[in-house]
Swiss-Prot record:
Belongs to the LysR transcriptional regulatory family. PROSITE patterns: HTH_LYSR (PS50931). PANTHER family: HTH-TYPE TRANSCRIPTIONAL REGULATOR, HTH-TYPE TRANSCRIPTIONAL REGULATOR DSDC. It comes from Escherichia coli (strain K12). Induction: By growth in D-serine. SUPFAM superfamilies: Periplasmic binding protein-like II (SSF53850), Winged helix' DNA-binding domain (SSF46785). This is HTH-type transcriptional regulator DsdC. Pfam families: HTH_1 (PF00126), LysR_substrate (PF03466). Keywords: Activator, DNA-binding, Transcription, Transcription regulation.
């Protein structure tokens, strides 16, 4: 049996830790040449460091052949243990940095929410938190937050993922909207009689399981209005349907939260008054579990303040 002193001498020390970095790069690439390129060393220098590490640890880490190197069984164990330790260390460093109200914050939102509600208000957030650098991404898919590097997402739906932490943001109502000119041309003011002769503008992806006409169908059913809800023009974003309505193309089913500024400015009108339908869906915020970072919490609090000021 080896003396205890000899075994202890083979445990990691400061000098060996620097060589472990060389080992990690070589193991990741399965190549001394590629490791040398990444580390700005010569292949022979990489090979020398690995040889020294193997000798000091008393473990053969690589099997060398003429054209390639491969990890031994023991080398694989060391590599995965090292990788796990580095990942844990990197996460701890990231968590420490994110305890401050600074750094980057990446947001993901449905395009219509971002364009009509979120982005116009962001100036207030950046004035309050100038040390937080924001990135806003948009899309209609429910993305993998961790894989996409997203800190916080805003969705409009009725089924938050059970794997994520979610926070209610605000509810929503829908109502028909069009341009003043279109309402006058089709005699829509305060009567739905002529609506059946109008072009209906649809958000085909209003929520995850939307059939493509659900908004118009639910409104027509609620008010017992006979409409050809399957006809009209479809868009993959609510704001595009609204833009089409502003350009006198037809009548869109507007989300009240997203169209209220245009109703107030007169760019749009609600020809049938306050004939709204409360949505089963709502706006909610999702984050990864355990991400109670101050900058994320600050943004969620700010979002809720915006809801109060725009209600």
């Amino acid at each position: 049996m080896e003396p205890l002193r000899e075994i202890r001498n083979r445990l990691l020390n400061g000098w060996q830790l620097s060589k472990m970095h060389t080992f990690e790069v070589a193991a990741r690439h399965q190549s001394f040449a590629l490791a040398a390129e990444e580390l700005s060393l010569s292949p022979s220098a990489v090979s020398h460091r690995i040889n020294q590490l193997e000798e000091e640890l008393g473990i053969q880490l690589f099997v060398r052949s003429h054209r390639k190197v491969e990890l031994t069984h023991e080398g694989k164990r060391v590599y995965w243990a090292l990788k796990s330790s580095l990942d844990t260390l990197n996460q701890e460093i990231l968590d420490i940095k994110n305890q401050e109200l600074s750094g980057t914050l990446t947001l993901y939102s449905r395009p219509s929410i971002a364009q009509c509600w979120l982005v116009p208000a962001l100036g207030d957030f950046t004035r309050r938190y100038p040390s937080i650098s924001l990135t806003v991404l948009t899309g209609n898919d429910n993305v993998n937050l961790q894989r996409a590097g997203i800190d916080l997402a805003i969705y409009f739906d009725d089924a938050p993922s059970a794997q994520l932490t979610h926070h209610f943001l605000m509810d929503e109502e829908i109502l028909p909207v069009c341009s003043p000119e279109y309402a006058q041309r089709h005699a829509l003011t305060n009567t739905v009689i002529n609506l059946c002769h109008c072009t209906l503008l649809h958000d085909r992806q209003a929520w995850s399981n939307d059939s493509g006409t659900d908004e118009w169908h639910s409104w027509a059913q609620h008010y017992a209005v006979n409409l050809p809800t399957s006809s009209g023009i479809g868009f993959d974003r609510s704001d595009l349907a609204v833009i089409a309505a502003m350009n006198h193309i037809g009548v869109a089913m507007g989300r009240k939260r997203l169209v209220q500024k245009r109703l107030a400015s007169g760019e749009l009108v609600a020809p049938f008054g306050d004939m709204t339908v409360k949505c089963h869906q709502h706006y909610y915020i999702t984050t990864l579990p355990g991400r109670q970072w101050p900058k994320i919490e600050a943004f969620i609090i700010w979002l809720r303040e915006q809801v109060k000021t725009t209600s």
